[in-house]
Amino acid sequence: MAAKNEWAEKDYYADLGVSSSATEAEIKKAYRKLARENHPDSHPGDAAAEERFKKVAEAYDVVGDETKRKEYDEFRSMIASGGFGGAGFPGGFRTQEGFDFDLGDIFGSGAGRGHAPQGGFGDIFGGIFNRGGGARNAARPTRGSDVETEITLEFREAAKGTTIPLQLTGDAPCHTCHGSGSRSGAPTTCTECNGTGFTSENKGAFGFSAPCTQCGGTGKMISDPCPDCSGTGTQRRTRSITVRIPAGVVDGQKVRLAGQGEAGPNGLPAGDLYVTVHVKNDRVFTRSGDDLEVTVPVSYAELALGDTISVPTLDLPVRVRIPSGTPNGRVLRVRGKGVPKRGGSAGDLLVKVEVTVPSSLDAASASALRAYVQAERDAGFDPRAGWAGK
């Protein structure tokens, strides 16, 4: 979900298609409708639908929460009333009590120590105005970096799901200090910020805070840095993991594995791993959503007289009955033999029957076929009866 420092660029009410005066029930109804229409399960492989779904979820995360919505509305009201001066907000703003703040002093646009606001309006404004400047404005890391990789699967592996080994090279927890960054494995709590990572200061009715300069915003102090990782808690190395690919993935789909990305510094959580799946074509099957399609060659006699034939599936073959008089190209449906779905069910197997004509006939077969043709004529059968081109 978006951080508060992105609220200035968002119109969450418009994203949900409601007015800013919409009730809680109206917002929830709009969210459910849009989430259902754009859910990734309904649009596998559709990146645009996935992006719309994320946008709607982000909007509802803010305006669907009473506390966040109040802060968001207050911020929009402040912007709309001209509470900030000029592009980039270089001037200042005035509270309702008429108290002037100089943004250069408050948000560190000038020289000296800057303070990122925290709490209520402080949280909102802190992210927005602490965008430029030097190292004091650097975002405090909260976890390790995400990692992206790609794999290629056979058609049937993707349809049924599989487990694959992967080797990844990147930041991993240090073996010596187990990710703490400390030789003893026990960093101490920063006495300057009492472990919060921030130091606070009050200016009138507002409270402001900034990353602690003593600990760099981590809340921890390392007096005995680990010699193998120089106190970072991470080492760059190659590691092997096993990745479970769920059944039914489609070509181009991304699978997210939480916590399998690069390790965070000084014991912070790891990032996520995103695996983009590529799927090879199959010689027998094609896919339509959760259904499998297969074309089976049959003889004219099997269609005319009816028969039972063996048809392949993702598992064992099944027996499929062809009713007598089945036309060429008819699709027969075998329920539950398609691509597995979440929850244990599966799509269907769509069997298209296609006549194969022999390229040559022996004397006995040719004689029998001629006898059949004569019998057709005697019975008055005309294959082109009712044909518009006749």
Curated annotation (Swiss-Prot):
Keywords annotated in UniProt: Chaperone, Cytoplasm, DNA replication, Metal-binding, Repeat, Stress response, Zinc, Zinc-finger
Co-factor note (free text): Binds 2 Zn(2+) ions per monomer.
Positions that bind Zn(2+) 1: C174, C177, C226, C229
A molecular function GO annotation: unfolded protein binding
Chief location bin: cytoplasm
Zinc finger (CR-type): 161-238
Pfam families, per the entry: DnaJ (PF00226), DnaJ_C (PF01556), DnaJ_CXXCXGXG (PF00684)
Location in or out of the cell: Cytoplasm
Gene Ontology cellular-component annotations: cytoplasm
Database matches in HAMAP family: DnaJ (MF_01152)
Protein family: Belongs to the DnaJ family.
Free-text function comment from the UniProt entry: Participates actively in the response to hyperosmotic and heat shock by preventing the aggregation of stress-denatured proteins and by disaggregating proteins, also in an autonomous, DnaK-independent fashion. Unfolded proteins bind initially to DnaJ; upon interaction with the DnaJ-bound protein, DnaK hydrolyzes its bound ATP, resulting in the formation of a stable complex. GrpE releases ADP from DnaK; ATP binding to DnaK triggers the release of the substrate protein, thus completing the reaction cycle.
Name of the protein in its database record: Chaperone protein DnaJ 2
Organism of this sequence: Corynebacterium diphtheriae (strain ATCC 700971 / NCTC 13129 / Biotype gravis)
